[in-house]
Amino acid sequence: MEAKIQFIKGLDEKVLPDVRLTRSRDGSTGTATFRFKNPNILDKSTAKEGEITGMYLIDQEGTLETRDVNAQFINGKPEAIESIYIMKSPEAWDRFMRFMERYGESNGLVFTKAS
């Protein structure tokens, strides 16, 4: 099973996100901010599929989800989706990183450490 991201269950998001990670100094918590520029979920053709109910990160281990999803508008038109996934334990961080590794492999993404 390929790792994928969905905003409406059953409808894969094709646009690749910019993902920014932060982690507490002690490693106990972390935040991932996903930004999708012009995602296909905002296309008029996908409007009939249903409403955005959250962001679902799906792989062979299961589903990670967040309800923290916001659209950004420019001149009255939706241009981007920003979603925040919060990890509240070192185990949740490790699980998220496993998902991102699979998602990156499936989509040709690379991890760049901040300098």
UniProtKB/Swiss-Prot annotation:
Pfam families: Psb28. It is found in: Plastid, Chloroplast thylakoid membrane. InterPro entries: Psb28_c1_sf, PSII_Psb28_class-1. GO terms for biological process: photosynthesis. GO terms for cellular component: chloroplast thylakoid membrane; photosystem II. The keyword Membrane applies. It is a peripheral membrane protein. It comes from the Eukaryota. Coiled coil: none annotated. The keyword Membrane applies. Keywords: Chloroplast, Membrane, Photosynthesis, Photosystem II, Plastid, Thylakoid. Part of the photosystem II complex. PANTHER family: PHOTOSYSTEM II REACTION CENTER PSB28 PROTEIN, CHLOROPLASTIC, PTHR34963. Belongs to the Psb28 family. This is Photosystem II reaction center Psb28 protein. It comes from Trieres chinensis (Marine centric diatom). The gene is psb28.
